[in-house]
């Protein structure tokens, strides 16, 4: 097996899921980058899907798309937002991918007639993919999805146990994230769930070096000492990760408890102070916001906010840029009431799939267009901008997307030519970064201030160029084009304060210290609109 020169931090979770392992891993990445180290982050997901691309957003949350077109776990979004890493398909490995690869090798005779088993064949495949993703990096942070004790996680935990033996304890660090419940009636923090979780991990053969404790409140020293004694770690290696109003405070909270120094000492690296100035500036901005804007998000998955994770963060980034708090007004597109939009400063129509809630989104777009409210359509949102305009301005009353009405006589949105006849849904959309050429003398050019941009995509349907002339005659222009195939990437309405749709997902490239230009402009114009009305 390939031997890596990288150091490895393995992050596991215990007690319950959704504790924030992804944010913790990303925050550790931010600390290490502050020390000038090159890093990568990887998520190992124990589910049997090859990727999350076909999973219901209510079950899995958002699908995050990388530059190279991988459909990945939303935690990769945290990794990219908190660090300078540009991740790829190597950075999200699922049990489905592992078993798929093992079975393909077995069919090709790669195992020379051996009985194929979880150990060593599946665990070897996991180790191989971990090592491949860590190439040429100082430190690889590897998050294992799920909770210790889950049957699905066992091959992954066994693989990282073996890796420590193979590459040496001096090159590996195990961090276990647990939950310490606060019983408010008794005013007491309970450590027993953490003790049992670590006991379970040790039974597998893994002794955590550091325990990060999630809790509603900060852990006092006596609680940390108790956890340290029962879990066989140093007291200073018990880190309190308490609830905060903004996740961007977490790198500073970890730094305050010397997590960076603990990691440096464990790996015998040069001892120096991390440069966290940009994080201090972000937190300072969030604590000194001058005003707020109300943005309506008209969506169909609003019961689970994780379905829009990158979008939420990108709006916050746009707010940070202008020292504004962004109040998100969640509007169910299936039960849209125009009263929900009366007092908002901007309307955002996010991406999505399927017919449910479409007409509500179209009504919201009509409201934003006719009332001259800053309105932003992303992916499906852009497509519905075209449908609404075709119906209510161009007079094509049955205008639609062939996704929702295959027999419409005015398919202003149609399936892409190369998507026709594709039967497999997984991994077959137009995915990843593509170039977009922006026309000068347009709002898009004013925002980007450059002709050529690269943005990430996830779609099968596109604007039908047969209708482009009709639209442009009436002031709805295509200001961004994919030059190789003349695909419409950005549309904007002239004689409107801010009515822009994009076929790509700008939220995937926004960072707290560098808001995406479209989100920054949208929030800025929403605030101008608010000031004009007050």
Swiss-Prot record:
L-glutamine binds at residues 58, 352, 380-383, 403, 460. It is an enzyme of class 6 (ligase). Transmembrane segments: none annotated. The keyword ATP-binding applies. The active site is at residues 379, 505, 507. It catalyses: UTP + L-glutamine + ATP + H2O = CTP + L-glutamate + ADP + phosphate + 2 H(+); L-glutamine + H2O = L-glutamate + NH4(+); UTP + NH4(+) + ATP = CTP + ADP + phosphate + 2 H(+). CTP binds at residues 17, 150-152, 190-195, 226. Pathway: Pyrimidine metabolism; CTP biosynthesis via de novo pathway; CTP from UDP: step 2/2. The keyword Cytoplasm does not apply. It holds the Pfam family GATase. Gene3D superfamilies: 3.40.50.880, P-loop containing nucleotide triphosphate hydrolases (3.40.50.300). Residues 294-532 form the Glutamine amidotransferase type-1 domain. Its EC number is 6.3.4.2. It comes from the Bacteria. GO terms for biological process: 'de novo' CTP biosynthetic process; pyrimidine nucleobase biosynthetic process. Allosterically activated by GTP, when glutamine is the substrate; GTP has no effect on the reaction when ammonia is the substrate. The allosteric effector GTP functions by stabilizing the protein conformation that binds the tetrahedral intermediate(s) formed during glutamine hydrolysis. Inhibited by the product CTP, via allosteric rather than competitive inhibition. Keywords: ATP-binding, Glutamine amidotransferase, Ligase, Magnesium, Metal-binding, Nucleotide-binding, Pyrimidine biosynthesis. SUPFAM superfamilies: Class I glutamine amidotransferase-like, P-loop containing nucleoside triphosphate hydrolases. HAMAP family: PyrG. Homotetramer. PANTHER family: CTP SYNTHASE, CTP SYNTHASE-RELATED. NCBIfam families: PRK05380.1, PyrG. This is CTP synthase. It comes from Hydrogenobaculum sp. (strain Y04AAS1).
């Amino acid at each position: 097996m390939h031997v890596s020169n990288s150091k490895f931090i393995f992050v596991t979770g215990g007690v319950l899921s959704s504790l924030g392992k992804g944010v913790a891993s990303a925050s550790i990445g931010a600390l290490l980058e502050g020390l000038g180290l090159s890093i990568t982050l990887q998520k190992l997901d124990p589910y049997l899907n090859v990727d999350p691309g076909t999973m219901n957003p209510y079950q899995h949350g958002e699908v995050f798309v990388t530059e190279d077109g991988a459909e990945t776990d939303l935690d990769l979004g945290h990794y990219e937002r908190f660090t300078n890493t540009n991740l790829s398909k190597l950075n999200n490995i699922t049990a489905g991918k592992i078993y798929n690869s093992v079975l393909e090798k077995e069919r090709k005779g790669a195992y020379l007639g051996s009985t194929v088993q979880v150990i060593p064949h599946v665990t070897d495949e996991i180790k191989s993919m971990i090592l491949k993703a860590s190439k040429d990096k100082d430190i690889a942070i590897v998050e294992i999805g799920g909770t210790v004790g889950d049957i699905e996680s066992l091959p992954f935990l066994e693989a990282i146990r073996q890796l420590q033996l193979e590459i040496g304890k001096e090159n590996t660090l195990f961090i276990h994230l647990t939950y310490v419940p606060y019983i408010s009636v008794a005013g007491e923090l309970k450590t027993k769930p953490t003790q049992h979780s670590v006991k379970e991990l040790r039974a597998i053969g893994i002794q955590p070096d550091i325990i990060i404790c999630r809790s509603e409140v900060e852990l006092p020293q006596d609680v940390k000492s108790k956890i340290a004694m029962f879990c066989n770690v140093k007291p200073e290696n018990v880190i309190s990760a308490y609830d905060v109003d903004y996740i961007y405070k977490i790198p500073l909270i970890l730094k305050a408890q010397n997590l960076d120094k603990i990691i440096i000492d464990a790996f015998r690296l040069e001892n120096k102070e991390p440069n966290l100035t940009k994080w201090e500036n972000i937190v300072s901005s969030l604590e000194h916001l001058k005003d707020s804007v109300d943005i309506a998000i008209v969506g169909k998955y609003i019961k689970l906010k994780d379905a829009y994770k990158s979008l939420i963060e990108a709006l916050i980034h746009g707010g940070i840029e202008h020292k504004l708090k962004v109040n998100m007004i969640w509007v169910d597109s299936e039960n849209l009431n125009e009263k929900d939009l009366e007092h908002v400063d901007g309307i955002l129509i996010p991406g999505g799939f399927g017919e449910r809630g479409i007409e509500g989104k179209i009504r919201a777009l009509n409201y934003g267009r006719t009332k001259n409210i800053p309105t932003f359509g992303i992916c499906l949102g852009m497509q519905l901008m075209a449908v609404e305009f075709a119906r209510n301005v161009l007079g094509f009353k049955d205008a639609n997307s062939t996704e929702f009405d295959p027999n419409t006589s005015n398919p202003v949105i149609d399936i892409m030519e190369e998507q026709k006849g594709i039967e497999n849904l997984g991994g077959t959309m137009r995915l990843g970064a593509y170039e977009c050429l922006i026309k000068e003398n347009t709002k898009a050019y004013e925002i980007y201030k450059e002709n050529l941009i690269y943005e990430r995509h996830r779609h099968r349907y596109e604007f039908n160029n047969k209708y482009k002339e009709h639209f442009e005659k009436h002031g709805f222009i295509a200001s961004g084009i994919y030059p190789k195939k003349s695909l419409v990437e950005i549309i904007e309405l002239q004689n409107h304060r801010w009515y822009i749709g994009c076929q790509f997902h700008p939220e995937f490239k926004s960072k707290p210290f560098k808001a995406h230009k479209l989100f920054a402009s949208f929030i800025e114009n929403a605030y101008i609109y608010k000031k004009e009305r007050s």
